[in-house]
Each structure stands twice: as structure tokens, then as C-alpha cells.
Regions:
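N-terminal start-of-chain detector that recognizes signal peptides
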Residues: 12-13, 110-113, 139
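Active-site beta->alpha N-cap acidic-glycine motif
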Residues: 1-80, 154, 165, 173
Length: 173
């Protein structure tokens, strides 16, 4: 909720790639994301290594099961944006995603923020993220990171001071 509060404060619309467990355990946050104009994309139902998923049936199930849960939760169809877990994929995955109508999205700026029990400090996060911003950056920040919730306001402020503005991925493609 703190991340959504910060985005609202800065009038920023973001893109969130969610998994099945997140929708199941935080349906109110997902509904709030939608209500506040954020884009919610597909990060698969179970967060597997997608480069290991070889069959169309298994691939389709990972994405469509999440689509169904999202629609059941929000009453809306999920937009066709997909981020492979851990950035792992195969060429056939990219083809299958495209055949399902998906835009596959990667990132250009990230840091190790995904270990919930081993979070970087505020200083480490700012040192890694502030100077590395660049035009057209797609920034990967995990919403489950306590550090990100703590530093997002300062990150956005510093980047805004450098002249940056922020868009959802569907506004870039």
C-alpha cells in the first residue's frame, strides 16, 4: 500500500507484473492498482523458470490461469503484457507469448531487491538506482521489497529533479 501511496503522491502510473499468489493474498491491492490507473501485467501464475516450459499447453496454462484469476478478482480483462520470471525465457517462449497476443517486457535498470529476508539498505538502493537512470529506462522494482517501499519517494523525487517523467509500459510500446 505504501508503494501505491507514493505513486499517487507523485502522480505516477506504474506497471505491476503480478503472480497468482499475489492476487490470491492481496486482492484489494490489485483492485486498487486498477482503480488508480496502473497497468497490471502477467508474471505467470506460479512463477516458474519459463525457459524450462517447452510445451504450448504448459506455457498457455501459466498465462491464462493468471488471466482468469485477475478477471475473477477485478472484473476486467488483463492487458497483454508479460514479464518472464527472473527474465528467463527461450525463443519458443517468446513466440508462444506473441501468439497469445502478449508483448514480452524486460527491464533495463534493476538491483537485487527480491530477497525479502536480505534487503539492501536505503543507502545501497539509492547508490545503485539514482545514478543509473537513463532515457527510456524500464525500472524493475519488486513491490514485495521493504526497501523499495522506503526509498521510492526519494527515488522518484531525485529522478524528477533530473527531468525524468514516468509512464506505464503500454504507453511506451
Amino acid at each position: 500500500a505504501k508503494i501505491l501511496d507514493t505513486l499517487k503522491k507523485h502522480n505516477v502510473k506504474a506497471t505491476f507484473f503480478v503472480v497468482g499468489n499475489f492476487i490470491e493474498t492481496s486482492p484489494d491491492l490489485v483492485k486498487r492498482m486498477v482503480k488508480e490507473g496502473h497497468l497490471v501485467g502477467n508474471h505467470t501464475f506460479t512463477h516458474p523458470d519459463m525457459s524450462e516450459i517447452a510445451t504450448e499447453e504448459a506455457f498457455h496454462q501459466e498465462l491464462s490461469k493468471l488471466e482468469d484469476l485477475y478477471e475473477k478478482t477485478t472484473g476486467k480483462k488483463m492487458k497483454k503484457y508479460y514479464r518472464p520470471p527472473q527474465g528467463k525465457y527461450s525463443e519458443s517462449n517468446l513466440k508462444m507469448a506473441k501468439e497469445m497476443g502478449y508483448h514480452t517486457i524486460f527491464w533495463s535498470l534493476a538491483y537485487v531487491d527480491w530477497y525479502e529476508s536480505d534487503q539492501p539498505t536505503r543507502e545501497e538502493a539509492l547508490e545503485k538506482m539514482v545514478p543509473r537512470i537513463h532515457p527510456g529506462a524500464i525500472v524493475l522494482l519488486h513491490s514485495t521489497s521493504a526497501t523499495n517501499a522506503q526509498v521510492l519517494d526519494e527515488l522518484l523525487t531525485r529522478w524528477e529533479e533530473k527531468g525524468y517523467s514516468f509512464k506505464r509500459v503500454d504507453q511506451l510500446t
